[in-house]
């Protein structure tokens, strides 16, 4: 949660989602994750997750690890296929003093919040390519978050035509990006310039945005004490 701002005469804030509410949160997100994992296990399929290397990937890993620890979802192989995300995660590990209180407690009591026996960080291009030859169930988290470059595009190329696979969208997708076309439900999408049929299911998680929604923005402003006149 953000630290309440100090008293001020003028407050300028961002308002990316100032006109809407995030529809999903807490239990709704957990239930959707449970459904995806159950589907992947039942169909021995892959969950391909385009994710930003900074922040979003680490958040996803921590969320998944927490759900497994709580017995809310069954563990399955998770591959973090982004060299940049791996380097950023190392920075996160080295600076637990920057965490909020809850995350810091997890780090000190349970060890590395970004590691588990079922989590593997992929480094080499050769290992990344082998993921496309593997059978599921598994989760592949790779950048770029909007599917415009990076290793995730290769995973989409190899997995998008399998109707048992799932593409989980966990972040904002700008117009004219491959990610936005997936969200919009295009049946044929361009991958490396080649029109490619989409048979995989696309599931959108709306509650994971790093941007505050209307209620959160209002709560932030109302927390100013004393309130500006």
Name what the model sees in each region.
Residues 1, 20-23, 58-59, 88-90, ...:
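Short helix/loop capping segments that flank catalytic or ligand/cofactor-binding pockets
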Residues 1-59, 65-72, 77:
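His/Asp/Glu-rich metal-coordinating catalytic cores
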């Amino acid at each position: 949660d953000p630290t309440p701002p100090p008293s001020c005469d003028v407050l300028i804030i961002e308002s990316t989602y100032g006109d809407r509410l995030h529809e999903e949160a807490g239990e709704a997100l957990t239930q959707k994750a449970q459904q995806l994992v159950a589907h992947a296990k039942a169909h021995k399929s892959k969950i391909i997750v385009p994710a930003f290397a900074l922040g979003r990937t680490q958040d996803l890993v921590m969320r998944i690890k927490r759900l497994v620890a709580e017995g809310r979802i069954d563990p399955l192989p998770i591959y973090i296929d982004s060299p940049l995300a791996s380097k950023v995660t190392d920075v996160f590990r080295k600076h637990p003093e920057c965490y909020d209180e809850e995350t810091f407690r997890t780090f000190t009591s349970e060890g590395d919040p970004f590691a588990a026996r079922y989590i593997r960080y992929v480094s080499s291009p050769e290992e990344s390519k082998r993921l496309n030859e593997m059978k599921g169930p598994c989760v592949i988290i790779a950048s770029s978050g909007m599917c415009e470059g990076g290793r995730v595009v290769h995973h989409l190329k190899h997995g998008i035509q399998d109707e048992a696979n799932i593409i989980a969208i966990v972040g904002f997708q700008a117009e004219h990006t491959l990610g936005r076309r997936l969200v919009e439900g295009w049946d044929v999408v361009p991958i490396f310039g080649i029109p490619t049929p989409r048979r995989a299911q696309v599931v959108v998680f709306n509650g994971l945005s790093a941007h505050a929604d209307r209620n959160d923005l209002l709560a932030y402003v109302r927390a100013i004490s004393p309130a500006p006149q």
